[in-house]
C-alpha cells in the first residue's frame, strides 16, 4: 500500500475510532459521499512532470478506499440507489457512491475488477469522443511533450 493510501486510510479510521467525527453537528455529517474519480492505473514508471497525476489513483489505493469505506459501515450503492434514498429521505444508513469520469480504458482494466471484488456498483460518465476515438486528449500529449524535455524555455508576451 502506498504512503498516500496509508495516510488516507489512517485519517478516516482515526476520525472514526477516536469519535472526533461525532463532535461535528449532524447537519455537517451528511448522509453519504460521492467519490468522483477519473483514472485508476498502476503508478507510472517516470517521476517527471505529471500535472495530470492528481486525477489518477492506483488500483491499490482504490482497494484501500473501498475497504475503509466498508469498514466504516457505509453502504456501497449505485447512483440510482443514492437518488432513491435522497428522494425518500431514507437517512438511516450512510452510503457511498463511486463515479468514473471520462471513460478511460483503465476504468475497465483496473477499476472494474476492484469494484467487483467489493461488490460495489459504479457509474461511468463517458465522454462522447472516447469510444469512437474522436476526442483529442491534448492535455496528455502536452504533458508527455513537456516531460520529454530537459529544459523548457517559456516567454510571456
Segments from the language model and where they lie:
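Terminal accessory/targeting
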Residues: 1-98, 105-157
Amino acid at each position: 500500500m502506498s504512503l498516500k493510501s496509508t495516510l488516507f486510510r489512517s485519517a478516516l479510521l482515526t476520525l472514526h475510532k477516536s469519535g472526533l467525527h461525532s463532535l461535528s453537528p449532524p447537519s455537517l455529517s451528511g448522509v453519504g459521499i460521492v467519490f468522483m474519480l477519473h483514472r485508476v492505473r498502476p503508478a507510472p514508471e517516470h517521476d517527471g512532470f505529471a500535472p495530470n497525476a492528481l486525477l489518477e489513483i492506483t488500483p491499490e489505493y482504490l482497494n484501500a478506499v473501498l475497504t475503509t469505506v466498508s469498514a466504516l459501515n457505509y453502504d456501497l450503492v449505485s447512483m440510482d440507489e443514492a437518488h432513491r434514498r435522497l428522494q425518500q429521505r431514507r437517512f438511516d444508513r450512510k452510503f457511498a457512491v463511486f463515479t468514473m469520469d471520462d471513460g478511460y480504458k483503465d476504468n475497465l482494466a483496473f477499476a472494474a475488477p476492484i469494484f467487483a471484488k467489493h461488490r460495489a456498483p459504479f457509474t461511468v460518465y463517458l465522454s462522447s469522443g472516447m469510444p469512437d476515438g474522436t476526442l483529442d486528449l491534448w492535455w496528455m500529449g502536452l504533458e508527455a511533450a513537456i516531460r520529454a524535455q530537459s529544459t523548457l524555455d517559456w516567454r510571456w508576451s
